[in-house]
């Protein structure tokens, strides 16, 4: 071991390029879908990071609609995080199998609160919680001129000539009924009992976002981060009850006893849930997490733009080598890895995928979008959004200290492994995703890869030095107009 102390040489994104290959593949024809686990299939290989300035429900909804996945961060209370997951799962459905409902004795105020919280425009009214016999419907139209919100729902709900359909009605059949009767919500009933709901909004969303990433019930996919802290047990339980599709056991060092034990426990308790564990940077760590029960392993120790782990702790593996080493081990288990961190351009995404990643996790590239929860600032006449690492002092004070195994320390004793900063405002997420995936598609065309599996298995790299990197970027010219997919 002593003799091999300096034997390892590692590479990162700026050290390599993909070699062009013979190709009859057009970028517009490539397949970007990827299966991360038995229950998680994405239509683009992109996941938004579980960071408190990157992903809450708004980002997760937008990511899933684009075909990717969002990880709700855990720097919030247990109930609040579960609510964020519920917002994603209820944002659109093919058929809502467990719709919200109220009873006629409840107040209009309660209805208004429910509709506002989940951004829904109406709710079915049933006789009681047990029998759930449909007796009316309450919509925004019924509430339009209400001034006294203390009155009972029974005083304002629509109860005559209710239009319903039987359980099993298809979306096409439902659309015809909704259009015929000029209504927006169609309750599904069986023997008078409310069993489901189809809305015109959900049908429109299916048409608007045909490649959305959804579960078997037609709901958008949602993931959430957990850690190894004292509240992890109840947090995981509440998230599963909220309908989460994947739990991300998110720590700075996944190759540790506490994380491995947590993976075993979570997978044994919730075998139906996809468990993602990390972060790691070696084949040995990847093997340990897969053997513990992880479905997917997340790779990256310190490559992120806001991470200082490598300079504070002196630890890490340059990301291309880390991804390749971990992917080599993952192949033996027939499982997937996620490349997390260090990605600055769309070209880095395809490099990470070609090195063995099934998907990439993005933070800085998405933090400036409209859907991120970071605060908007104006600096020197330009709009920015706040972006910080989960190892920064601010994030650790809000709850991410357990990620860095400092749960028992007071804020004054924290040793941060991240910084707080700002990133340029970019507008809607879909514009950024379009440019990023356009770059990936182009790279797949250059390498003759019609799908991501072929890219992983057959794409070849060449190493380059600093001169090669300088040659790769625009040079000997002054840029006069910003490009939507390049800034340096």
UniProtKB/Swiss-Prot annotation:
It is an enzyme of class 1 (oxidoreductase). Residues 95-153, 157-216 form the CBS domain. Its EC number is 1.1.1.205. Residues 475-488 have a biased composition (Polar residues). Its cofactor is K(+). K(+) binds at residues 302, 304, 307, 471-473. The active site is at 307 (thioimidate intermediate), 403 (proton acceptor). IMP binds at residues 305, 340-342, 363-364, 387-391, 417. Pathway: Purine metabolism; XMP biosynthesis via de novo pathway; XMP from IMP: step 1/1. NAD(+) binds at residues 250, 300-302. Belongs to the IMPDH/GMPR family. Catalyzes the conversion of inosine 5'-phosphate (IMP) to xanthosine 5'-phosphate (XMP), the first committed and rate-limiting step in the de novo synthesis of guanine nucleotides, and therefore plays an important role in the regulation of cell growth. This is Inosine-5'-monophosphate dehydrogenase. It comes from Staphylococcus epidermidis (strain ATCC 35984 / DSM 28319 / BCRC 17069 / CCUG 31568 / BM 3577 / RP62A).
